[in-house]
């Protein structure tokens, strides 16, 4: 792994989000999340890309004076256009290592609308939280119902005993930014 600098000791929120779509509402949401994290004096840790929602969240955080830590696997440096403007850019060997660094660095997690990679990150951190590997807040910020199908399926799994109610309670699903940030706040 390589890094540009040392991160200040601040509350850190990992944001999991998309690396491909450029829907205006998604980019606006990601930008609002980045700006709000910075406004609170928190550090943003994200997937290290400078495209789609990843680029919007990090650019907005920096534009509002926030500290940004990008974590990107070597194989995606060019595909996701690594954000070399990050205050710290960690280049990992593998996707697994990327997720581990993000999880280790974060005090809380916010998931925005995204695809397979975003789901992978969410499910991984949720599973680890449920298993007691951490007690960090896991927030899904879903203002447009992007995750409604997933939530319905998970509810069915809980109803049939495949997912415990305790596991379901670990997920904090909100539809507005203020509630997401409140759920991530220290203390």
Curated annotation (Swiss-Prot):
A GO cellular component entry from the record: cytosol
Family: Belongs to the LOG family.
SUPFAM superfamilies assigned to the protein according to its UniProt record, in alphabetical order: MCP/YpsA-like
Protein name per its UniProtKB record: Cytokinin riboside 5'-monophosphate phosphoribohydrolase
GO molecular function, one term: nucleotide binding
Superkingdom, natural source: Bacteria
Pfam families xrefs: Lysine_decarbox (PF03641)
Purpose: Catalyzes the hydrolytic removal of ribose 5'-monophosphate from nitrogen N6-modified adenosines, the final step of bioactive cytokinin synthesis.
EC number: 3.2.2.n1
InterPro entries: LOG (IPR005269), LOG_fam (IPR031100)
Residues that coordinate or bind substrate: 80, 98-99, 115-121, 127
Protein species of origin: Mycobacterium marinum (strain ATCC BAA-535 / M)
Enzymatic class: hydrolase
Keywords noted in UniProt: Cytokinin biosynthesis, Hydrolase, Nucleotide-binding
One of the GO biological process terms: cytokinin biosynthetic process
Catalysed reactions listed for this entry: N(6)-(dimethylallyl)adenosine 5'-phosphate + H2O = N(6)-dimethylallyladenine + D-ribose 5-phosphate; 9-ribosyl-trans-zeatin 5'-phosphate + H2O = trans-zeatin + D-ribose 5-phosphate
């Amino acid at each position: 792994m390589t890094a540009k600098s040392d991160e200040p000791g601040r509350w850190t929120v990992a944001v999991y989000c998309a690396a491909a779509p450029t829907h205006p509402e998604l980019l606006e949401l990601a930008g609002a999340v980045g700006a709000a994290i910075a406004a609170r004096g928190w550090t943003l840790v994200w997937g290290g890309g400078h495209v789609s929602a990843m680029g919007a969240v990090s650019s907005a955080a920096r534009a509002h004076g926030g500290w940004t830590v990008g974590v990107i696997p070597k194989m995606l440096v060019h595909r996701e256009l690594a954000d070399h403007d990050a205050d710290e850019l960690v280049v990992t060997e593998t996707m697994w290592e990327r997720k581990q660094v993000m999880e280790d660095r974060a005090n809380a997690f916010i998931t925005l609308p995204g695809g397979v990679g975003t789901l992978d990150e969410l499910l991984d951190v949720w599973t680890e939280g449920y298993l007691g590997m951490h007690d960090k807040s896991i927030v899904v910020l879903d203002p447009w119902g992007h995750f409604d199908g997933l939530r319905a399926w998970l509810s069915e799994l809980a109803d049939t005993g495949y997912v415990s109610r305790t596991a379901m309670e670990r997920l904090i699903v909100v539809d507005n930014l203020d509630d997401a940030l409140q759920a991530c706040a220290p203390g």
